[in-house]
């Protein structure tokens, strides 16, 4: 089941995060950047339950292909011509319980400072990771980090690129990589991997030469309010001894306002029904107990960072109806949103309780 969701995630990310961004620059071929990096790091012991695994120093390699935006779409100039890229990443964890991992991710690489010879960038990406070695109750029960072979990955990185020649650049970087299946399969403490990087970039064009285009006017919807109605579904495993995957669904009503070219602010109400909580409650309650309602309702505020049809989503919510106290009183959400049309959108979101993944939400909605 996780594999099916994983390939759906890969399709959406590769189709919207890479090709969708690139499609807007199709009239003029934008220059490419090819990179090869060596990486080294350590596993962060973010909970006592994984300290026995945070003893090695993983090493890895990355190959990536980036397209330098050049002004063919209005948002290129708004973000000072970022790069969009596809990366293939390999890690050897030097620990037999963890083995190796292979990942593919799409990302945006935003420059904060750029001269003819130097760049200082922030990179943010997401994708899929594959772990041949995972938790097995009989043979690998100490691997509490990785419960499934297929996992989502999130990557954040600071990079410094300095020119060695007209086309060749030396790259130094600091990164944080996260691997998790979003509680679809337990155990799922996930891997947090701080890294240092050293590598080379081949720039097809340096320095950047944006297209000579006229300044674009403000989008017509800046300052306008909108209403979003959406529903989401997800599946999660309760624990490693219960192999059933339980349905989690939600409905959301949100209001928002586009405050500038780059940002939407949103606030909403939503209701949740997590069927794994019913099973959990029945396991712990006495037969004579009156069971509380496992449904929850919450209110949230959030931000959407806009890249054409694509947006990075972040929410912070509070439960105001929570009879069964199975988690903290607040929740967070990180995700990717894509507008298929002006009205119809889809999301892939990770809902989190206090840093621990709760569920991956697959959302479909309507903007009014």
Regions found by a protein language model. Give the residues of each.
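Membrane-embedded beta-strand positions of outer-membrane beta-barrel proteins
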Residues: 34-38, 84-86, 122-126, 156-158, ...
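Transmembrane beta-strands of outer-membrane beta-barrel pores
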Residues: 38-44, 67-69, 88-94, 126-134, ...
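Bacterial Sec-dependent N-terminal signal peptides
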Residues: 1-35, 120, 168, 194, ...
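Outer-membrane beta-barrel "beta-signal"
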Residues: 63-65, 192-213, 357-368
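Repeated loop/turn-to-beta-strand initiation elements of outer-membrane beta-barrel proteins
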Residues: 72-75, 116-120, 162, 166-170, ...
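Extracellular loop and loop/strand-boundary signature of outer-membrane beta-barrel proteins
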Residues: 48-51, 91-94, 140-146, 182-188, ...
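Solvent-exposed loop/turn segments connecting transmembrane beta-strands
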Residues: 55-56, 92-101, 116, 239-246, ...
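Outer-membrane beta-barrel architecture
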Residues: 62-66, 107-109, 157-159, 199-201, ...
């Amino acid at each position: 089941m996780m594999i099916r969701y994983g390939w759906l995630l890969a399709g959406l990310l590769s189709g919207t995060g890479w090709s969708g961004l690139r499609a807007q620059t199709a009239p003029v071929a934008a220059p490419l950047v090819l990179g090869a990096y060596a990486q080294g790091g350590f596993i962060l012991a973010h909970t006592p339950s994984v300290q026995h695994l945070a003893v090695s120093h993983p090493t890895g390699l990355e190959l990536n292909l980036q397209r330098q935006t050049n002004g063919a779409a209005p948002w290129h100039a708004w973000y000072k011509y970022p790069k969009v890229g596809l990366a293939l990443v390999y890690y050897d964890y030097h620990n037999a319980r963890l083995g190796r991992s292979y990942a593919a991710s799409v990302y945006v690489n935003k420059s904060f400072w750029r001269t003819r010879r130097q760049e200082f960038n922030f990179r943010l990406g997401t994708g899929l990771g594959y772990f041949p070695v995972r938790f097995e109750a009989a043979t690998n029960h100490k691997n509490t980090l990785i419960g499934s072979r297929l996992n989502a990955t999130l990557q954040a990185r600071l990079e410094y690129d300095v020119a060695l020649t007209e086309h060749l650049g030396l790259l130094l970087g600091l990164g944080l990589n996260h691997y998790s299946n979003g509680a679809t399969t337990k155990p799922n403490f996930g891997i947090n991997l701080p890294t240092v990087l050293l590598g080379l970039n081949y720039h097809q064009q340096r320095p950047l030469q944006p297209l000579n285009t006229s300044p674009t006017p403000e989008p017509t919807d800046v300052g306008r309010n909108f209403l979003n109605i959406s529903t989401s579904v997800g599946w999660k495993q309760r624990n490693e001894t219960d192999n059933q995957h339980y349905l989690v669904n939600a409905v959301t009503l949100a209001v928002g306002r586009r405050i500038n070219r780059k940002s939407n602010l949103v606030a909403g109400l939503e209701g949740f029904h997590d069927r794994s909580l019913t099973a959990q409650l029945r396991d712990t309650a006495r037969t004579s107990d009156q069971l509380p309602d496992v449904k929850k309702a919450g209110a949230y505020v959030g931000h959407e960072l806009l890249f054409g049809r694509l947006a990075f989503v972040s929410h912070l919510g509070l439960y105001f109806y929570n009879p069964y106290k199975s988690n903290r009183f607040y929740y967070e959400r990180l995700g990717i949103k894509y507008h298929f049309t002006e009205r119809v959108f889809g999301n892939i979101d990770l809902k989190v309780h206090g840093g621990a993944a709760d569920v991956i939400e697959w959302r479909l909605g309507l903007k009014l």
